Curated annotation (Swiss-Prot):
The lineage of its organism: Bacteria, Fusobacteriati, Fusobacteriota, Fusobacteriia, Fusobacteriales. It comes from Fusobacterium nucleatum subsp. nucleatum (strain ATCC 25586 / DSM 15643 / BCRC 10681 / CIP 101130 / JCM 8532 / KCTC 2640 / LMG 13131 / VPI 4355). PANTHER family: LARGE RIBOSOMAL SUBUNIT PROTEIN BL27M, RIBOSOMAL PROTEIN L27. GO terms for biological process: translation. The keyword Ribosomal protein applies. It holds the Pfam family Ribosomal_L27. The N-terminus is cleaved by ribosomal processing cysteine protease Prp. This is Large ribosomal subunit protein bL27. Signal peptide: none annotated. Residues 1-10 form a propeptide. It comes from the Bacteria. Belongs to the bacterial ribosomal protein bL27 family. One of its GO terms (cellular component) is cytosolic large ribosomal subunit. Keywords: Ribonucleoprotein, Ribosomal protein. GO terms for molecular function: structural constituent of ribosome.
Length: 94
């Protein structure tokens, strides 16, 4: 006598599945750090930005990640260049 068994095993717990969400990136802390009229020292970061939302004016340096920083001690001055552009300068006196 011969017996033929056909055994099928199924999962006894539901699979977890996959999702495309569920991640978050670290904060980048972008934005204006020193505002119009504030006193700054040489090397102070004025704006951290992606691209040149603000352009470097007088006595300002620009980093490789478009960070604007002061080259001299003085006061921050936000200025308009034409209709759309904005620039930031540092002046030694108000």
């Amino acid at each position: 006598m011969q017996f033929l068994f056909n055994i099928q095993l199924f999962a006894h717990k539901k699979g977890q599945g996959s999702v495309k969400n569920g991640r978050d990136s670290n904060p980048k802390y972008l934005g204006v750090k020193k505002y119009d009229g504030e006193v700054v020292k040489a090397g102070n970061i004025i704006v951290r930005q992606r691209g040149t939302k603000y352009h470097a004016g007088n006595n300002m340096g620009i980093g490789k990640d478009h960070t604007l920083f002061a080259l001299i001690d003085g006061y921050v001055k936000f200025e308009r260049l034409g209709k759309n552009k904005k620039q930031i300068s540092i002046y030694s006196e108000k």
